[in-house]
């Protein structure tokens, strides 16, 4: 199973309609679009998927739709993390029911939980996942939970944990984790340092911008596999030019707007309180969509 979890995994966006409801048809198109561009797998219901502005029922619905569209074609990882252990367990059970390959959970956040409470939280989710491997999700910039290296080492050695999504710019820590855990599946989480993350020991990555240019990240993997560091650097630079624009527009709404211009997502809106993209960026995003479509073809 560990080998199946390696690779380039798109952190799937969740499309909504003008009434802020789940757009299931756009979601299905987005899943197919990711499969067509050669993604190894999907990370469903995470930060990029706006999970924390959805109800548990909506998150279950997203898992079900994605499984219907992609099960057996690519690797599927369900992010089931919530502040509540019970809510996370409910989603983990759903992931098992729908045939996902693994579950993942962000560290419980908002309240100042003790580290032992974090460990108990993961143990309970792993139990509810009924044999599915766990991907621990470390994202200190958003969760506010700043794990020490020793704490990370403890979490990734809990029974049932197979992987770590390391969304941190600390490449030294990435290398330390790899050195300490040679068999752990280790994902780079920040797209802008994907190539550097691989060189620091990551097996692959989970990222939001893979939704619109996954083939570039696959190209970086292939270039490094062949020892062509210069090519990997060039591809990373091209990815980062896109990321520069998305940071200006707001990453999730910018991605949805690009996918709208690619005829994948019907409505380029995130759920409130996220606002729409500022209209001044629309020409640049439209040009980017056209460029990427031509490149993909």
Curated annotation (Swiss-Prot):
Keywords linked to the UniProt accession: Carbohydrate metabolism, Cytoplasm, Lyase, Schiff base
Signal peptide span: none
Gene Ontology cellular-component annotations: cytosol
Principal EC category: lyase
Gene Ontology biological process terms in this record: carbohydrate metabolic process; N-acetylneuraminate catabolic process
InterPro entries: Aldolase_TIM, DapA-like, NanA, Schiff_base-form_aldolases_AS, Schiff_base-form_aldolases_CS
Catalyzed reactions per annotation: aceneuramate = aldehydo-N-acetyl-D-mannosamine + pyruvate
Pfam families in the cross-refs: DHDPS (PF00701)
Residues of the active site: 137, 165
Principal location: cytoplasm
Subcellular location: Cytoplasm
Family stated for the protein in its record: Belongs to the DapA family. NanA subfamily.
Subunit structure: Homotetramer.
HAMAP family in the record: N_acetylneuram_lyase (MF_01237)
Name of the featured protein: N-acetylneuraminate lyase
Natural source organism: Salmonella arizonae (strain ATCC BAA-731 / CDC346-86 / RSK2980)
Gene: nanA
